Amino acid sequence: VIPHQLADTDGDGRTDTLLFQSNFRPGTARDFWILNDSSLKAAPSADVCFSRLVPERLDDFAWENDLTAHRIYGPAVARPAPEGEGLVSSGTDVWSKRAGAPVINEFYKRGDYHRDHGRGLDMYNVGPGRGCGGIAVFRDGKPHASGNWASARALYNGPVQTAFEVVYAPWDIGGGVRVAETRRVALDAGSRFSKVRSTLTIRGAETVKAGVGMDTGKGRNDYETVTKDREDGGLMTAWSRPRKNDGCLGTAVIVPWGPEGGAVDSEGCTYWIREAANGKPFEWYMGAVWDKASPFKSSAAWEAEARRVRECVRHPLRVRVR
């Protein structure tokens, strides 16, 4: 019996998907049987993949699995002090965590997560940029990013996958055009990459130039290496040392579609650009690694891992139900 979970992936309140994991070599096939559970041992049921709203910390929304953890910012933190922190950002934060142990509830309960007490820490600097991944809409060569998310809901947690959805309220990009984003994020057990599906609601135009980007400038995280590759879908990786004694962070964004032109650098971030139509979703991936808690100890090793993941995205499994 392998870890598995039943999930409501479309949010209608009814279970519609069976999720499970297995490893495959290229060109191989495997058979799986769905049997009556009365004669089987129970599969592990721990919520390895977990996401939740964090109202006790100014409306953060956080998610994690056994390898990585992230958070994004809600409306409360955007309020001026003392009610909030005045942080307006739709970028993604990275938490450096040691593999295996969940940290979200522990970090927030402790409150002191900017120092490593043995489980990891938050040393990444997001600021108003895209962080480890985010959207901006370009007009006249300038990026226009949303504010903090306006609403958020966890969809499901479990041993195989967690998923949630956030909505970014309409923002002006100029020329009488307003854009809103609905973002659905899923993270699998054993993966350092979250899968993101963004759907833009556009008013005042039929299409816009959407940029999927991440932080790459020197100002926030002291990046040592940044790579960009648009072959077979856009890929960018970065390797940084935000603090002198806490190791290095690798971040990456993968887009499984052909970007328009080369990567665009603007305001400390790098973007892959595509045309986006009203109501038509597009997918992208964001990931991160901490060298003190992974086999990836260099920028080259992290870039190679990101390229491997891109190959997996480009060549998905084919499933047949008999």
Model-derived features: where do they sit?
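Solvent-exposed beta-strand/loop surfaces of large extracellular or lumenal domains
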Residues: V1-T17, D172-G176, R220-T237, I254-P259
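Extended, loop-rich substrate-binding clefts of extracytoplasmic carbohydrate-active enzymes
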Residues: N105-G190
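Short, hydrophobic/aromatic-enriched beta-strand segments in well-ordered soluble domains
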Residues: R30-L40, F164-Y168, V212, K280-A293, ...
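Solvent-exposed N-terminal domain segments of exported/luminal and surface proteins
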Residues: S38-P143
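Beta-strand-rich recognition/accessory modules
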Residues: G13-F24, T251-R322
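Sequence-level preference for short, compositionally simple segments enriched
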Residues: W33, S51-L53, G74, L87-V88, ...
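Alpha-mannosidase-like glycoside hydrolase catalytic domains involved in N-glycan trimming
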Residues: V1-S51, L87
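Acidic (Asp/Glu-rich), glycine- and aromatic
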Residues: E181-R183, L187, R192-T227
